[in-house]
From Swiss-Prot:
This is Large ribosomal subunit protein bL20. GO terms for molecular function: rRNA binding; structural constituent of ribosome. Binds directly to 23S ribosomal RNA and is necessary for the in vitro assembly process of the 50S ribosomal subunit. It is not involved in the protein synthesizing functions of that subunit. Pfam families: Ribosomal_L20. GO terms for cellular component: ribonucleoprotein complex; ribosome. Keywords: Ribonucleoprotein, Ribosomal protein, RNA-binding, rRNA-binding. InterPro entries: Ribosomal_bL20, RIBOSOMAL_L20_CS, Ribosomal_protein_bL20_C. Belongs to the bacterial ribosomal protein bL20 family. The lineage of its organism: Bacteria, Pseudomonadati, Pseudomonadota, Gammaproteobacteria, Pasteurellales. It comes from the Bacteria.
Length: 117
Protein backbone atom coordinates (compact mmCIF):
# COMPACT_ATOMS: atom_id res chain seq x y z
CA UNK A 1 0.00 0.00 0.00
CA UNK A 2 1.26 3.43 -0.93
CA UNK A 3 2.25 5.92 1.76
CA UNK A 4 -0.09 8.89 2.12
CA UNK A 5 1.62 12.16 2.96
CA UNK A 6 -0.79 14.64 4.57
CA UNK A 7 1.49 17.65 4.93
CA UNK A 8 -0.41 19.93 2.56
CA UNK A 9 -3.84 19.04 3.93
CA UNK A 10 -2.73 19.31 7.57
CA UNK A 11 -1.10 22.69 6.92
CA UNK A 12 -4.28 23.96 5.23
CA UNK A 13 -6.45 22.76 8.10
CA UNK A 14 -4.17 24.36 10.68
CA UNK A 15 -4.06 27.64 8.73
CA UNK A 16 -7.86 27.69 8.56
CA UNK A 17 -8.21 27.32 12.34
CA UNK A 18 -5.44 29.81 13.13
CA UNK A 19 -7.03 32.32 10.76
CA UNK A 20 -10.37 31.89 12.57
CA UNK A 21 -8.57 32.39 15.92
CA UNK A 22 -6.91 35.64 14.81
CA UNK A 23 -7.21 38.30 17.50
CA UNK A 24 -7.57 35.81 20.35
CA UNK A 25 -5.34 36.29 23.41
CA UNK A 26 -2.00 34.50 23.83
CA UNK A 27 -1.71 30.84 22.86
CA UNK A 28 -5.33 30.82 21.68
CA UNK A 29 -4.21 32.62 18.53
CA UNK A 30 -0.83 30.89 18.07
CA UNK A 31 -0.99 27.23 19.14
CA UNK A 32 -3.15 25.00 16.94
CA UNK A 33 -4.40 22.73 19.72
CA UNK A 34 -5.52 25.60 21.94
CA UNK A 35 -6.80 27.64 18.99
CA UNK A 36 -8.93 24.72 17.79
CA UNK A 37 -10.67 24.46 21.16
CA UNK A 38 -11.13 28.24 21.31
CA UNK A 39 -12.68 28.35 17.82
CA UNK A 40 -15.05 25.46 18.63
CA UNK A 41 -16.12 27.16 21.87
CA UNK A 42 -16.57 30.49 20.08
CA UNK A 43 -18.87 28.77 17.60
CA UNK A 44 -20.93 27.31 20.43
CA UNK A 45 -21.23 30.71 22.10
CA UNK A 46 -22.20 32.33 18.78
CA UNK A 47 -24.90 29.69 18.14
CA UNK A 48 -26.32 30.06 21.65
CA UNK A 49 -26.19 33.85 21.68
CA UNK A 50 -27.91 34.25 18.30
CA UNK A 51 -30.95 32.77 20.02
CA UNK A 52 -30.45 34.67 23.27
CA UNK A 53 -30.20 37.99 21.41
CA UNK A 54 -33.86 37.68 20.38
CA UNK A 55 -34.93 37.06 23.99
CA UNK A 56 -32.78 39.87 25.36
CA UNK A 57 -34.11 42.45 22.92
CA UNK A 58 -37.69 41.45 23.74
CA UNK A 59 -36.88 41.85 27.47
CA UNK A 60 -35.40 45.29 26.78
CA UNK A 61 -38.46 46.39 24.80
CA UNK A 62 -40.81 45.18 27.54
CA UNK A 63 -38.78 47.00 30.23
CA UNK A 64 -38.93 50.24 28.23
CA UNK A 65 -42.66 49.92 27.54
CA UNK A 66 -43.31 49.12 31.21
CA UNK A 67 -41.36 52.17 32.39
CA UNK A 68 -43.17 54.48 29.96
CA UNK A 69 -46.58 52.97 30.74
CA UNK A 70 -46.04 53.39 34.49
CA UNK A 71 -45.14 57.06 33.95
CA UNK A 72 -48.59 57.35 32.39
CA UNK A 73 -50.30 55.52 35.28
CA UNK A 74 -50.70 52.04 33.84
CA UNK A 75 -48.81 48.78 34.34
CA UNK A 76 -47.31 46.94 31.37
CA UNK A 77 -49.74 44.03 31.52
CA UNK A 78 -52.81 46.30 31.71
CA UNK A 79 -51.42 48.47 28.91
CA UNK A 80 -50.89 45.48 26.57
CA UNK A 81 -54.31 44.07 27.52
CA UNK A 82 -55.91 47.45 26.80
CA UNK A 83 -54.20 47.67 23.41
CA UNK A 84 -55.42 44.16 22.51
CA UNK A 85 -59.00 45.09 23.51
CA UNK A 86 -58.74 48.32 21.51
CA UNK A 87 -57.49 46.15 18.60
CA UNK A 88 -54.26 48.12 18.26
CA UNK A 89 -51.73 45.78 16.65
CA UNK A 90 -48.32 47.34 17.25
CA UNK A 91 -45.41 45.05 18.08
CA UNK A 92 -43.27 45.56 21.17
CA UNK A 93 -40.26 46.77 19.20
CA UNK A 94 -42.28 49.63 17.70
CA UNK A 95 -43.98 50.38 21.02
CA UNK A 96 -40.58 50.65 22.73
CA UNK A 97 -39.36 52.98 19.97
CA UNK A 98 -42.44 55.19 20.38
CA UNK A 99 -42.01 55.15 24.18
CA UNK A 100 -38.41 56.39 23.89
CA UNK A 101 -38.65 58.87 21.02
CA UNK A 102 -42.28 60.10 20.91
CA UNK A 103 -43.72 60.48 24.41
CA UNK A 104 -46.86 62.32 23.19
CA UNK A 105 -47.83 59.52 20.81
CA UNK A 106 -47.18 56.95 23.54
CA UNK A 107 -49.40 58.89 25.96
CA UNK A 108 -52.16 58.79 23.32
CA UNK A 109 -51.75 55.01 23.05
CA UNK A 110 -51.98 54.72 26.85
CA UNK A 111 -55.22 56.73 26.82
CA UNK A 112 -56.60 54.48 24.09
CA UNK A 113 -55.67 51.41 26.15
CA UNK A 114 -57.24 52.91 29.30
CA UNK A 115 -60.51 53.62 27.50
CA UNK A 116 -60.65 50.04 26.18
CA UNK A 117 -60.25 48.50 29.65
Amino acid sequence: MARVKRGVIARARHKKILKAAKGYYGARSRVYRVAFQAVIKAGQYAYRDRRQRKRQFRQLWIARINAAARQNGLSYSKFINGLKKASVEIDRKTLADIAVFDKVAFAALVEKAKSAL
